[in-house]
């Protein structure tokens, strides 16, 4: 076994990747990511002690969420970049260690090493370092929730929003994960606390996005192309998009969104740019084919990278920024001294490229985040009371490569016409281009936005609970049938559990990192379930 990773839904054989990641990461990269996470836990222990003394390190705060983000599925495949981050972390850890003394410090605090020692150490600090499978399962569940939370924290930070309370929790949780004597009950409570702070992190990002760009509104998004050279922007970071739009305005270059960047078109302060031309392509996993025909440069702002084939025509057109890493790609450095990122090289490259080749046409409707749906509340409530809407189906989450995900297309197609789908995240691409119609002018697919906008769906549910005078969110006519893929979906799930939502169905498979006993806890306490066939599930959910 040269590595072990089971953090994503597509993990090999449904048990774990041991030779190379299904995502495309090498065993070396996987092991180095384990070592980076090990270093992060040590930094967290030191910074938690410094926080108790009243002077935590802001540099440590940022390093921790940035490093966690790097280890998310499909974010960083660059061995050299991860080694640099480990070295940076060890230096930071040593600086913190000089300021505080810790009795009985864990190995995460004590270990130091040179690059030639990284590989050997990495093999001892991965997932399998914890022998008890239930403790291991819960530790990894918390780890993955923290990774998802870190992504949301970083995007909010880029817009000038941060929370000392969230930093404090993340670091105290990481410190707890260094304990060898931690109990299953303690970890269950830590898991629930992770969900609670996940709600706070999503609320913070929602505030950052809406205060910066306005509340999402019902918007029509073009799926075709124009005749100008284009830049395709993928990932989730709206600040990167804003700066790119500003720097390309008046240059004759059009900007197209890809996958999870689609909801940018719903924000008033982003869609005002006339050269934000449309959305190109589908969910992240189809990029190897779709990027070939785009013809212009592609900018990755966060996880959603699929390493290109060796003979891919677009390899030299890939640009990355933020936590992203891909060997051979052009890197856009971070902001310095409050100045925007410099996209001039990317823009110059785009000017030398042909316009994108059309791969589809038509439009999409979206923008149904919580403020927009609340504005339509009277119409929605009347439709429910009259029986025009029988049930809502929350089908948020992620898309992926597996053929079993065709279930979600079939499920959406077969739902009765008196049902409405509430969605967020790239799971929407399984059904957002189907002609599912509307109910009294309300589209049957209401897209709230990116995966973090699952927060909007929770706010909508809580608002409906209030409007209908119910004492329990689970009494609403809402079914949760969520598709998961990576760690941001994990924090969304934990956040929903923290909000009291029960009977969530998760697919296409349950996570490999859930041991049988942990799975039973989730089933017994929260009603977590899997999926079967579209026909069987629709019959069950509507009964």
From Swiss-Prot:
Cofactor binding summary note: Binds 1 [4Fe-4S] cluster.
A biological-process GO annotation: response to hydrogen peroxide
MF term (GO), any: metal ion binding
* Reactions that this protein is recorded to catalyse: A + NH4(+) + H2O = hydroxylamine + AH2 + H(+)
Task: Give cofactor(s), names only.
Answer: [4Fe-4S] cluster; hybrid [4Fe-2O-2S] cluster
**SUPFAM superfamilies attached here?**
Prismane protein-like (SSF56821)
InterPro entries per record:
HCP/CODH (IPR004137), Hydroxylam_reduct (IPR010048), Prismane-like_a/b-sand (IPR016099), Prismane-like_sf (IPR011254), Prismane_a-bundle (IPR016100)
Keyword annotations for this protein, in alphabetical order, are:
4Fe-4S, Cytoplasm, Iron, Iron-sulfur, Metal-binding, Oxidoreductase
Q: Where does hybrid [4Fe-2O-2S] cluster bind?
A: 236, 260, 304, 398, 426, 451, 486, 488
Instruction: Note the superkingdom of the native organism.
Output: Bacteria
- Name its cellular compartments: Cytoplasm
Q: Which residues carry this modification: Cysteine persulfide?
A: 398
> Which residues are involved in binding [4Fe-4S] cluster?
5, 8, 17, 23
Specify whether Metal-binding is a keyword of the entry: yes
Q: Could you give one GO CC term from the UniProt record?
A: cytoplasm
Q: Does 4Fe-4S appear among the keywords?
A: yes
Top-level EC class: oxidoreductase
HAMAP family in alphabetical order: Hydroxylam_reduct (MF_00069)
Against NCBIfam families, the record matches this protein to: hybrid_clust, PRK05290.1
**Similarity comment text for this entry:** Belongs to the HCP family.
State the protein's purpose. Answer: Catalyzes the reduction of hydroxylamine to form NH(3) and H(2)O.
Give the protein name, as stated in the record: Hydroxylamine reductase
- Which gene specifies this protein's sequence? hcp
